From Swiss-Prot:
Homodimer. Probably interacts with PlsY. Transmembrane segments: none annotated. This is Phosphate acyltransferase. Pfam families: FA_synthesis (PF02504). Its EC number is 2.3.1.274. The lineage of its organism: Bacteria, Thermotogati, Deinococcota, Deinococci, Thermales. It catalyses: a fatty acyl-[ACP] + phosphate = an acyl phosphate + holo-[ACP]. Pathway: Lipid metabolism; phospholipid metabolism. Its main location: cytoplasm. It comes from Thermus thermophilus (strain ATCC 27634 / DSM 579 / HB8). Keywords: Cytoplasm, Lipid biosynthesis, Lipid metabolism, Phospholipid biosynthesis, Phospholipid metabolism, Transferase. One of its GO terms (cellular component) is cytoplasm.
Length: 326
């Protein structure tokens, strides 16, 4: 199995991206770097690594419009999608322009049957392990039917990740049926009819971290706000802990005793540990990461893509969508 990595995608590409690819290759991932061959090979030489490169002379910059991918067939992310469509790779990972990656996936791969809009799945750490939220930002405005499809795809991903009998919660401002805006109120009966016992009902923001359900569905605007809020809060809490543990000589002594435990906590809330978000609902395995990703995040994105392809994620998504009871 081979994964195409957009070597030109990200704030610090190709340096960080190539470094992450080299690290993933050492852990058994077969990576094909797609990008400007001269730049990519220069980075490989600097690292003393030997990975295959597919030349793509163009790339979509962060400040450019996502629609640019339509008129630039030699852009690295579009070339990677073409390789996926032809079966020369089994997944695509990009840490670059998320809008351009979404546009390229829709343009080249198309949607899975039964999907009106693809969704980004975001993984949150929780007291029970992890919670998968859709949509993480691909669709700011949603119809109720979109949330039903998000739920089916989220269940497929949770099952591919090893969850047993996962359930879906609908993000709202109260647990009771009837709470929430028009979208939530209209989606509730559709989810109940489509999912049966797999639908838990309404959940609140805190339930994402409590792990009340394995999957949470919402519109992409709300989902992205939740993601950025969680990232900011994690950063603030870690900063406060660091300040408290370095505030005095006694505190620094105490810090030595809990150093390993704190390192484990930090790892659980570090976005780099999750690598990239899967774009569910397109005809192929596509993963989109942070533009600010470091080499660890790139490596973990590739490892996640490999694991999900091996778990048959796309087939699971198709099956879940075809089994909807509506």
């Amino acid at each position: 199995m081979r994964i195409a990595l957009d070597a030109m995608g990200g704030d610090r590409a190709p340096q960080v991206v190539v470094a992450g690819a080299a690290a993933a290759a050492r852990e058994g991932v077969e990576v094909l770097l797609v990008g400007d061959e001269a730049q990519v090979r220069a980075e490989l030489a600097r690292l003393g690594a030997d990975l295959p490169v597919w030349h793509a002379p163009d790339h979509i910059r962060m400040e450019e419009a996502a629609t640019e991918v339509r008129r630039r067939p030699q852009a690295s992310v579009r070339v990677a999608m073409e390789l996926l469509k032809r079966g020369e790779v089994q997944a695509v990972v990009s840490m670059g322009h998320s809008g351009a990656t979404l546009a390229a996936a829709l343009l080249v791969l198309g949607r899975v049957k039964g999907v009106e809009r693809p969704a980004l799945l975001v993984e949150f750490p929780s007291l029970r392990g992890r919670t998968f939220l859709l949509d993480g930002g691909a669709n700011a405005d949603c119809r109720p039917s979109f949330l039903v499809q998000f739920a089916a795809m989220g269940l497929a991903y949770a099952e591919a990740s090893g969850a047993l009998a996962p359930r879906v919660g609908l993000l709202s401002i109260g647990e009771e049926e009837g709470k929430g805006n028009a979208l939530v109120q209209e989606a509730y009966p559709l989810l109940r009819a489509a999912l049966g016992e797999r639908f838990y009902g309404n959940v609140e923001g805190r339930d994402i971290f409590l792990g009340t359900t394995e999957v949470v569905v919402t519109d992409g605007f709300t989902g992205n706000v939740a993601l950025k809020l969680a990232e900011g809060e994690a950063r603030v809490l870690l900063t406060w802990i660091k300040e408290a543990l370095t505030s005095s000589f006694r505190a620094r002594l105490g810090a030595l005793l809990v150093r390993e435990a704190l390192a484990r906590v930090k790892a659980r809330v570090d976005p780099a540990q999750y690598g990239a978000m899967p774009l569910l609902g397109v005809e192929g395995a596509v993963f989109i990461g942070h533009g600010s990703a470091d080499a660890l995040a790139v490596k973990n994105a590739l490892l996640r893509a490999k694991a999900m392809v091996e778990a048959g994620l796309l087939a699971r998504v198709r099956q879940r969508l075809s089994a909807l009871h509506v």
